[in-house]
């Protein structure tokens, strides 16, 4: 089970970027089964003594619970919400980490309130494809963490501590699992010394695949996912004082159309005629909304008046585009295979309604510890993620609107810090970090192809009027070409520090 932090008699004064006084009294009732050392505050501390709200899982606990990724883990951490669904975008495209229900109405990573770190290094973009096979410990920290983690941590942060290669023993491991919907998950790793007691290496790989969970009206599958990844860590300890760690990670995801759909409030209205009290104490009478429990598939009414909610077009051979243009490959030629904007030329090419993503991550750290316990650390990381994604914009079987939403993300970070020994009564830490990010995207709509502009009066909005007119009419219109409206560039320079003083054996003052 997870281990929770316990503050028996502690006070934490969080200054600088956080500025709050925090006591996590609720954790007092949580049982402690084993001693876990965490590094959420850039130094090794006992989970039972650290003065912040933190939940930690060891590798043994992750394996015992059968957690394979962050989505499965999130259900065991109060206040943490994570799923592949990012805002209103179905599928594993723009996944968001949420703490205590806080979120932003932004599709880009720049304004995220919760972020993932690997060995304390910021991870830009998708987190779902990082498996737990190579993770030694997961630390979930709730509440503002800008003092130590920097940007995008107003609500909290998650830190993966990766396994350290052995300098003495050779080990290997193979894991395999299978589930419904033709799902399988296979991973393997090897670990051992290259130079006895001096240099070790750990390498691993993973294959994951899941078949369709639903079948669309056109016969295509919905919910198909596949991932393959590989990682390698080189660890060197040339002297007792110095340790060096280099890590590389690569992953590729290929998903089909998402198993998702929309439930329109106007057709499933259970609010009209009811009055509700808002948080501000005002009385409201909502209309065309869903009140209470969300209706399930088979009960809810979809946008076409039927009862099949999980549905969409899965083929690039659009019948409506053929009626309008006479070209059965109009959608393929003018959207899926259309040349990218020059700023997005490196994203993966796609051939159908699908999502493809590639990720590269490199990181390195150097740590030196003197005889008096003072430790100096220098670390840096580089992330590169490129995505291309074509979807049925309406998520209904209506042959109407399609979009292609590519994005290119790249960042690097550098950090240096120095800390006193942790066994003394007065402890200190200080450091500086630099972060640079480039995010190029068209997630505000990207390339859009509308094959249905005209509608039939009296029928649901967007219902196509069959029209074999030539392409010069409004029924087949191509709009936009990667306007890259979501593009941004970020540079951040930060300085952080922390002081701790044991006033008594039972009472510690922390200033950050």
Predicted regions and their residues:
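Transmembrane beta-barrel architecture of outer-membrane proteins
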Residues: 24, 65, 94, 155, ...
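Secondary-structure transition into beta-strands, especially the periplasmic turns and strand N-termini
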Residues: 28-32, 135, 167, 182-184, ...
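Acidic, small-polar-rich N-terminal luminal/periplasmic segments of exported/outer-membrane proteins
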Residues: 33-167
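Structural signature of outer-membrane beta-barrel domains
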Residues: 43-45, 123, 179-181, 208-212, ...
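Outer-membrane beta-barrel translocator/receptor signature
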Residues: 112, 125, 133-136, 142, ...
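Periplasmic-side early beta-strands and strand-to-turn transitions of outer-membrane beta-barrels
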Residues: 159, 168, 175-177, 191-293, ...
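Extracellular/periplasm-exposed beta-strand and loop segments of Gram-negative cell-envelope proteins
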Residues: 177-179, 214-223, 259-265, 325-356, ...
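A surface-exposed, glycine/aromatic-enriched loop/edge motif typical of exported proteins
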Residues: 244, 248-331, 437-467
